[in-house]
Amino acid sequence: MKKFWKTTLAVAMTACMAVSLAACGGGSASSSSDSTAAASQSGAAADGAIKIGGSGPLTGPAAVYGNAVKVAAEMAVEEINAKGGVQFALQFEDDKHDAEEAATAYGTLKDGGMQISLATVTSAPGAAVSPLYQEDQTFAITPSGSSPSVIYADGEGMTGAYGNVFQMCFSDPNQGSGSATYIAAHPDLGSKIAVIYKNDDPYSKGIFDTFKTQAAADGLEIVYEGTFKGDESDFNVQLSDAKAKGADLLFLPIYYTPASQILTQADKMGYKPTFFGVDGMDGILGVEGFDTSLAEGVYLLTPFVANAEDEQTKTFVENYKARANGEVPNQFAADAYDCVYALAQACEAAGVTADMSNADICAAMVEQFTSMTFNGLTGSDMTWNENGEVTKAPKAMLIQNGEYVPAAE
């Protein structure tokens, strides 16, 4: 099993470096006009700071993700600026997990002089604005936009890489295949698998598709596949069908709000399988009105465990909690923190300065990210390929006594 977690998880693609550099060629298309009333500006940087922009859901049902990214990114910017080397100024906008809102946020960030981007927090908005990063020759790295459509023009076929949009998070295909292989290596979790996924969401469907393929390769038995769309909140039919099929493990490649509803409704009907999710379920313990005792024993695949004992994680968690009213950081926060530090490492190595054009900064960032190794909260010896996919090992996390703890490898 340990050998699996050490293998390369990024998909090997054939696009060449020329494509990446082409995405950053020419002059800057970013506006240098002054920004007014930004949703969030942080950094306390000196004059000459490199302007970083980003957007995510700060309001609405996915706000736990966006606010975690915002807090962690602000924290990283302030720490980096205090060191006196490369200086950043951060502007972060609310996109409400909506593609049109994300496009509006992009325009605001561009008008504010954005030179490098943290892209978007969630996948659907990311897929909508990634072509704009390529068009404007602005380098972007998303902490958590995991769909292939965020970094590929053809997300389903995983072709046509933008070349200048990178991911810090696992891609959806890797989450699906990684989950299946972990479950296969731990047969005590369950032998008959049911899946409930959101079939109008590229994130959810993308994970399911690769989970199903890998499950077949690993000899897992999927006895039921249930779907839902939009804002559906009644899952009694799907749960009843899964229970009738004898499923003793329920795989949920979905976000935390519907996951909390599924756990609640399963409990009411006396259905108690092992629940297994991915990064979108990180945050379920913070759902308002949810009985968190129902999440006891839930498994998640994630790159970050807040209860890890290494000093870097402990310091990050302590500082984050001090800024976030005692809230424990999720993996979205950790990925965002890593994004900012990876950008700082790349900027320092490339000698990037604020007076450079977006295109020149973009080319320098692509060159650095495709050649450097980065150590962060969410992985050691991380690397990126020319398509923007990251290579790092996932970890399984278990909810125990109301806390996230490392699960067996």
Name what the model sees in each region:
Residues 19-23:
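C-terminal motif of bacterial Sec signal peptides marking the signal peptidase cleavage site
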Residues 1-11:
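Bacterial N-terminal signal peptides that target proteins for export
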